[in-house]
Amino acid sequence: MKPAAPLPSFSRLLREPVLLLAFGFGSGLAPRAPGTAGSLVALALAAGFTGLSFTLPAAALWLLLGTVVAAGIAICGSAARRMDAPDHPGIVWDEFAGLWLTLALAPAGFGWWIAGFVLFRIFDIVKPWPIAWFDRRWKGGLGIMVDDLLAGLFAGLMLRVAGAVL
């Protein structure tokens, strides 16, 4: 088994902007559960983007999400190469994108966003089929991003169904 890749220093993140983004502005440096730490930062940023209204105009939301995903493929791929680790656990930009996809699909409201956070983390950690299948087979920046995007999609669709039923 290959030893875990070491964490970069925060000063290295500041010197290398792609690592600063990939490591979620430093949240990926958390010694335990960096994915959850990154997801919490992503949740806080999303709340800030919406002015705590927990909703954005659809066009702005999907444009922002598309940009985050496209940039994320490049950011995660570059960071993985710089860290010499195919999917370093500290790279959490993919958590940002996945959670934001969940929130884009969620009904508006604080409670829905908290439920989305929890569901997203469950899908991202447990990785049910087909998430695990993609996680094992796809490599590079797209491979790092795809499992979190699928986790975000699954969590968001569950919230949509729950919102329609409730």
Question: Residue locations for each model-derived region?
Answer:
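Interhelical loop and helix-boundary elements at the membrane-water interface
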Residues: 2-40, 54, 73-103, 122-153
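Short hydrophobic/aromatic-rich motifs at helix boundaries and adjacent loops
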Residues: 17-18, 47-51, 59, 70-74
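Short Lys/Arg-rich amphipathic alpha-helical segments
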Residues: 30-49, 60-64, 68
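Helix-coil boundary and interhelical linker segments in multi-pass alpha-helical membrane proteins
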Residues: 46-63, 102-114, 160-166
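Alpha-helical transmembrane segments of multi-pass membrane proteins
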Residues: 47, 65-74, 98, 103-104, ...
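Final/C-terminal transmembrane alpha-helix of multipass membrane proteins
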Residues: 148-164
